[in-house]
Amino acid sequence: MGVASRREAEDWIRAGRLTVNGELAVLGSRVGRTDHLRLDGRLIHRHEVVAGQVYLCHRSPGENLRTPEEPSEHQALVDRLPRRAGNRFITVSPMPRIDGGLEIVTSDGGLAMQLQRTVHALSSEFSVRVLGEISEPSIQAILEGMLDRGEKLQVENCEAGGGEAANRWYTIVARGGSGKDIRQLFERQGAVVSRVLRTRVGTLTLDRALSRGQFRPLTKEEIDALISPPAADAAEADAEHSE
């Protein structure tokens, strides 16, 4: 199955935590690739971590995933990544070049495709730096989540944080929002935004020990949590993609 050891799976079955196609799993059951498995109601996406592939948590300083053929005054991200998987890397839901923060980078195309879908079912947290303070009516308008193109973003929270000189930081939590969407929510209220940083995707948080431009390997547990969001969230994402 690629998501647990045999002993762990047997423990889940005995505890009645694992279902196959809506039915409680029993010891000795055979599971095919088209069967739907859920653990505690949470859909299990059976993606195996592939040996030799690279799975990274990257603290983006605000840049595109450039190749060596695209000159830049800064060292390209691809030049800093591990060489063993070649030079083909994919950034999942990349932050705009002028912003930065948490990004997921992988050389595994199959995983990248799954993550592109599931990240829209997960709540993400952003820190937004603006000039001056935002009024309470503007905060309420941001919470409504209306975007320029007429779409509506599900904003779960928006609150003021600290400040530095004339700038103020705001923390916003939204489901499936991109860095561009978050910036747009604030600019629609007349805010002058100088920085948008993504600090969390689902349960994966930005590692503050990482300097800008650095990365660390993702653990298997972190990957599993990203590709297997809670059942209710996955169902919501499916509904959005079917519209």
Q: What are these model-derived regions, one by one?
A:
Residues 1-243:
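Basic, flexible Lys/Arg- and Gly-enriched helix-loop patches that mediate nucleic-acid binding at interfaces
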